[in-house]
Amino acid sequence: MKSIWRRRDFLFQSGGGISGLALAHLLNQDGLLAASQPAACDAKAKGYNPYAPKPPHFAPRAKSVISLFMSGGPSQLDTFDPKPALTRYAGKPLEGKGEVVVRQGNPGPLMPSPFTFRKYGQCGMDVSQLFPNLAEHVDDMAFLRSVYGKSNDHVQATYELNTGKIQMGLPSVGSWVTYGLGSENQSLPAFVVIYDHRGGPLGGPANWSAGYMPAAYQATVFRSAGDPIIDLHPPAEIGPERQRDRLDLLAKLNEIDLKNYPGSSELAARISSYELAYRMQGCAPEAVDLTRESEATLKLYGMDDKTTEPFARQCLMARRLVERGVRFVQLYHGGLGQQNRDTWDAHDNVKENHTYHAAEVDRPISALLTDLKARGLLDSTLVVWHGEFGRMPISQKGVGRDHNPGTMTVWMAGAGIKGGQIIGASDEFGYKAEQQPISVHDLHATLLHLLGIDHTRLTYLFNGRNMRLTDVYGELIPQIVA
């Protein structure tokens, strides 16, 4: 610990402070050195490199993942899992399902969807009126209608979808993927999070933390508004030679400590993070520069519409990142603010809430799938859409819906997945997963499998135990991996 503080003292005393040297988002405790003269985008990492490409356990179907996280919990009943029984039994209590546990207030009567559904594609998939653009892709999408979670609390449920457990402090799925496979681009982070312009999700950075792993495996946060990467450039008075000299000197100090404490994986990861920050100077600005896109592409995503522009920007950045070898990109839609307005948390009015939020994402997500397919990237990219839980078939406050971890719909596309299929089913009211219930561990095991990773073999030794993303659970979803 003393040597770490000496390095910090050196940084401050050498002028400019950490803010002038750091990519603050890459390493919260120490920051990362930046350079005013960037390294080449194909530069190789020096010394120990946690991002070095690692061989998969078997031939992968996907190289990258784009996770589309709809914060707040979209309603499966009003999007991709229609329930005619809700119309037949509208206004009646939900019976025969045991104790009905709600998050707020008392259980209301059964409430039909305020949205109409129609069939799309050669497969005849039912999709609500909320997603007219996305519905055109159903033949490339697999709908998992029986995914369930353990908590009806936003924070706990979000942690579960990201880490497999409802408590904080564990490595996220993106961290596990980075740890298991490394990165195909040594000048960009392997794991990137881009959250909503209104703010990050409930639970904050613990959702993309590396937990008990070295900090190098946590996500790098890119902003969806303004400069995507903060603190990328040092102060103008610090020239490239001076900056490079500082980086080299700091690396030497770290190397001395690494020799004295060879078991310090955190220190080794910190050294590699400094080098990554230096290399990012060259290619990160280009990777997120949307002005390089054609007018037709910008319009396709909805950059010309103030409603769709924020999430269009996130989706377009995601495509550019996976195109450049970034392994795991997670986009959050719905941010902190007024929870019932700024997220999919439709306690008050599901029609008003979901109409508003679906309009923000329908066109951009549709464009993302179109663009990936046109560029030949969809076969090597797994796209996953979900929230933290589903919603209740009973009403809340007359026209809203409460949280429901009992079932939700997740869809997947790309990675050679057979599209146009429905996997699993919820009960007649959409209250509980009934046919082929799919746990979050099953979801994670399947995601890792598509990347060529056996979830039972991907382990990290912590406190004397070989830890897994899926703990001692997790079954592959056969229709997805077939």
Where in this protein do the model-derived segments appear?
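Ligand-binding pockets and gating/stacking loops
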Residues: 1-482
